[in-house]
Amino acid sequence: MNRLKSFSLVIVIFLFSSLVFAGGHSKGMYIHIINFNITGIDRSQYEAAAMKLTSVFAAVPGLKRKHWLANEENNTYGGVYIFDSKESHDAFTESELYAGVKGNPSFTNFSGKSFENIDSLAKHTRGTE
């Protein structure tokens, strides 16, 4: 068996045994990523309005970090929200704050996706705290 196949087999066995012996997946951090296009405002207006909300986001229970995203060339903006638990993530995505972001008339083509962090892998790449 060549080295790549051997390595792949070891990885598959490790992942399977981790799931079996750990009782499933990790219950650690949850991540929510949103994207949208802005309409009727430019980037500087968006940033000025967002600056007024930074303290509101900083006060969200369980929110460890929020990264603000911008790709001005493609008119795509958004955020990466990192939560300490699924519960805090769920509370945020069901909150009035999130509904306000999602329903903002200056944001079109809104999409939001949720992910759990794979802590068993992330701990090796500075993806956990």
Label the model's feature ranges.
Residues K5, L15-Y77, K86-E94, F110-E129:
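Short S/T/G/P-rich N-terminal loop/turn motif that feeds into the first structured element of a domain
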Residues M1-L9:
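Bacterial N-terminal signal peptides that target proteins for export
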Residues V80:
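Beta-strand acidic-aromatic groove motif in beta-rich domains, primarily in extracellular
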Residues L97:
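Short, polar loop motifs at secondary-structure junctions
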Residues G100-T108:
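C-terminal structural segments of small proteins and small subunits
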